[in-house]
């Protein structure tokens, strides 16, 4: 539909491509299957559903919110004058994504291919179209042309996929979208689509000529790509700042299951989840990561797991999600205001929902420490740290809990992870000299 809407922007002059190019999408399909057998999920690079949903989530959705806020800014003076207070102060949180520009380039490139020929992507590159073409021989509906056909070829010229042959009465069913454009444009009303009951249709044979050499090249290319992606040294050299969403399954399975659709990032109410670039190699491109310096992970939200279509992020209830430990906060003493400059700062402790920050007397100054068994890596401390630039306390994937199945709560109990909110008193001083517990302001 997106390509159909965009075709009106371009001239009708097209370059006619040889039928041989139609085999490209089949080669891509074979290569992607071979890569999957080699352990690499590369579907997100060519799957139109993943590309479209990712474009909507990362690019079109933020633009829609921006347009809505700009429209509200125009209406605010009138709303204030009319006393419509709710409208006067209404505003939507503006989501931002780091790969918006790259996504725009990819989407624009696919659309611009229409300059060459209508639906270039669908005709020559789409592996999903190749798969549906293979399955078309089992299709229910068939294009039928009756005796009123005058062979005017109007249907042939109008077909967006070029599926109608030189004889307008026949069609390559493997290329036909069943869009009914030919039926609408036919001046003699000679075209109809009727249900057929034959499990194998003669007109549905694949409209490409695949040689054995080309088939083997596609297979070997896919296997080689799969090997290169899985053997990428950056895949194992995961950076300390790469934090996955709560409930994400183990990393190897996660990279295989995630289709990079962007649904979790769009659903994230704090805009914490951002698409990765090459943080863990090419294979991690567009996978979600938690950018906790930008925003913490809201503890009363589990939308990312609810919307994940492949359960790369498990759908956990709020209590279970709390124990899906994302990592552990680590204090960078060389940047911390208390450790480096002996200043009085309690912000990380004030922000921690589970009292995982405690203070000990060191060299006569109260200095912060992290209790690893009370930290689930939510990132409130990192997000609110007053140090300019990178925070002095950062969440690293140390002790992260990634389960493909089973209870996070039970696993947390086994590892002595306690995440109960403690009211009343914070144990600021655990060892050494100094006053006793200081009453919490909570």
What are the functions of these language-model segments?
Residues 1-175, 180-442:
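Non-ligating segments of multi-cofactor redox enzymes
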């Amino acid at each position: 539909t997106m390509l159909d809407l965009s075709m009106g922007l371009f001239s009708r002059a097209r370059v006619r491509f040889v039928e041989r190019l139609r085999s490209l999408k089949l080669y891509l399909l074979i290569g992607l299957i071979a890569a999957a057998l080699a352990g690499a999920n590369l579907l997100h690079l060519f799957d139109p559903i993943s590309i479209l949903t990712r474009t909507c989530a990362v690019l079109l959705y933020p633009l829609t919110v921006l347009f809505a806020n700009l429209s509200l800014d125009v209406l605010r003076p009138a709303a204030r004058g009319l006393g419509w207070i709710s409208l006067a102060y209404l505003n939507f949180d503006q989501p931002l994504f780091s790969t918006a520009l790259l996504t725009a380039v990819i989407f624009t490139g696919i659309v611009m291919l229409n300059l060459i020929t209508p639906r270039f992507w669908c005709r020559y590159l789409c592996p999903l179209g190749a798969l549906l073409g293979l399955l078309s021989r089992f299709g229910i509906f068939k294009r039928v042309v009756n005796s009123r056909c005058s062979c005017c070829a109007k249907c042939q010229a109008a077909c967006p996929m070029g599926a109608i042959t030189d004889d307008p009465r026949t069609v390559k069913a493997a290329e036909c979208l069943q869009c009914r454009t030919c039926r609408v444009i036919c001046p003699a009303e000679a075209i109809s689509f009727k249900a057929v009951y034959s499990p194998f249709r003669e007109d549905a044979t694949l409209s490409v000529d695949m040689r054995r050499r080309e088939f083997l090249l596609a297979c070997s290319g896919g296997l080689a790509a799969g090997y290169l992606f899985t053997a990428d040294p950056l895949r194992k050299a995961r950076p300390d700042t790469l934090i996955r969403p709560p409930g994400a399954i183990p990393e190897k399975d996660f990279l295989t299951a995630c289709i990079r659709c962007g649904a979790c990032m769009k659903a994230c109410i704090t805009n914490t989840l951002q698409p990765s670039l090459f943080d863990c190699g090419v294979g991690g491109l567009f996978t979600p990561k938690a950018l906790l310096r930008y925003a913490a992970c809201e503890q009363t939200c589990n939308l990312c797991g609810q919307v994940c279509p492949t359960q790369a992020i498990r759908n956990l209830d709020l209590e279970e999600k709390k124990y899906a430990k994302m990592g552990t906060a680590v204090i960078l003493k060389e940047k911390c205001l208390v450790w480096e400059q002996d200043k009085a700062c309690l912000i990380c402790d004030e922000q921690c929902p589970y009292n995982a920050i405690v203070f000990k007397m060191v060299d006569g100054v109260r200095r912060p420490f992290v209790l690893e068994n009370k930290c689930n890596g939510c990132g409130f401390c990192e997000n609110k740290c007053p140090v300019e630039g990178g925070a002095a306390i950062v969440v690293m994937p140390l002790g992260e809990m990634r389960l493909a199945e089973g209870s996070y709560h039970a696993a947390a109990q086994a590892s002595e992870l306690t995440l109960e909110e403690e009211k009343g008193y914070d144990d600021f001083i655990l060892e050494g000299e100094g006053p006793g517990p200081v009453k919490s302001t909570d």
